[in-house]
């Protein structure tokens, strides 16, 4: 039995969990008010506060346990391969001093290493697993149509690869031998084609389908006009925070839109059907990447809780492959399962190179 501690830092919280193999024994969310975090100038200034709180929690709730590994949520690294990355000084230095963006997940590696050193068995490793910048895209998929812009692999890699592993197990085939299409839709959205264990193409949240808050891909000529009518920050906000459902209804809560639809609101029904329509188009696009050889299609994220959207997607895509619905996110389970595969020598970890 392997004892694994998981750390998932977010903007105003740190989620932690203790697993024995893949069984969750304990979980807790340490929350912070904006006032508590206000004195800190940057994310890494919060390290001591968050670490102290984690250590206190371990001493109180999980006494006398020595962890075989500690795994943290990834961070905004340059493009990396999928799977586990061993936490070392190079990795921490990049996340601290040269991250692509400031984000709480950049603390995951440092927190994991510190906890492993204090509460792990002798030489217990610490990892991050499947950060959002996992990049296994085929070179042909990077071509955008402009020599000034490359398509990027940015998406919900941790959850998408985790649910692909889960469905592969249900189908009794190795993930490394199957072909899967995974769509994650929540506040943002992304979709991916998995071919023989590699995520060979990714549709990011500025392409194709809209979500609760993002516009997705929108008509470019009209978008160019919008750029000249508003500032960069205004356009960014309109497309990334006030797009999607927020743009049409002023809320990112899909449940409220469903209530409107259930009460006869035709606009609500049309927009929700359009969301399912665009999700289906993304699936169709990725099916061509896999040349139609698809073992399963998976819809995940918050929107997968919608029976209306799930059913509408199913109507359009099940001629390609069976559709599996896996609502929500499985980040903590995914981190623990990834670390367990490394400890059991089912996967090898990667070493980050500057």
Residue map of PLM features:
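Short beta-strand-loop/turn "lid" adjacent to the catalytic site in phosphate-handling enzymes
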Residues: 58, 62-104, 125, 133-145
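Adenine-nucleotide phosphate-binding core of ATP-dependent small-molecule kinases
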Residues: 237-292
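Glycine-rich phosphate-binding/hydrolytic loop that grips phosphoryl groups
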Residues: 304-305, 311, 324-354
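Phosphate/pyrophosphate-binding loops at sites that engage ATP/ADP/AMP, CoA/4′-phosphopantetheine
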Residues: 55-69, 169-173, 282-295
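Short glycine-rich, Thr/Ser-proximal phosphate-binding strand/loop in the N-terminal lobe
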Residues: 4-45, 205, 209-210
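Glycine-rich phosphate-binding loop plus the immediately following alpha-helix
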Residues: 107-110, 128, 143-179, 187-188, ...
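N-terminal phosphate-binding loop and adjacent alpha-helix
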Residues: 27-66, 91, 95-102
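Glycine-rich phosphate-binding loops at beta-strand->alpha-helix junctions
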Residues: 294-313
